[in-house]
Regions:
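Non-catalytic accessory/interaction domains
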Residues: 1-12, 16-170
């Protein structure tokens, strides 16, 4: 997930800083996170929830397409079940790679960072209703709650270039 958030070059910068600071030392996850954050000037405070909270987040997907406005709206909501000693969970910082596949072959690819309980993204100039390819490259270890039609699953299975989502759609 670090490489997904930082990009390949940013991840490399973080690794270089990590080894510069800690080579040969006994370190913690916090040391690794600090090196990634410092090397990329990125606040990863919320990312620590992955280390401090038990359980796997569940992400619910809701989508809406407005043909008249040529606008696609994607709403993601995250929850995590209570666990012993943690009856309530804070939102995780979840990086999700997505791609919108359309009949016109307009492919919008984006990295979404889900940091709140619910967030909505709007995509303009989408010529026809897209098929959503989400959590590409298994960008986050989540449980996905997403009802897709058989037609959409067939489109992903036959046309998606992401091996993880092709497998999941089958």
């Amino acid at each position: 997930m670090y490489q997904t958030l930082m990009g390949r070059d940013g991840f490399r910068k973080g690794m270089d800083l990590y080894f510069q600071r800690h080579d040969g030392q006994a370190v913690t996850c916090d040391d690794f996170l600090a090196a990634m954050a410092d090397a990329n000037n990125k606040d990863l405070t919320q990312f620590k929830n992955w280390y401090s909270q038990a359980g796997t987040p569940r992400v619910k997907v809701q989508e809406r397409y407005d043909a008249a406005k040529k606008q696609y709206e994607l709403t993601l909501s995250q929850t995590c079940a209570p666990s012993p000693g943690q009856p309530e969970k804070k939102p995780f910082h979840i990086p999700l790679k997505i791609r919108l596949l359309t009949k016109a072959n307009d492919q919008v690819e984006k990295l979404l960072e889900l940091t709140k309980e619910t967030q909505t993204w709007t995509f303009d100039n989408i010529e026809d209703r897209p098929v959503l390819s989400i959590n590409r490259d298994f960008s986050a270890p989540i449980n996905l709650d997403f009802e897709q039609s058989e037609e959409d699953l067939l489109t992903l299975f036959s046309s998606d270039d992401d091996p993880f989502n092709r497998w999941e759609s089958g």
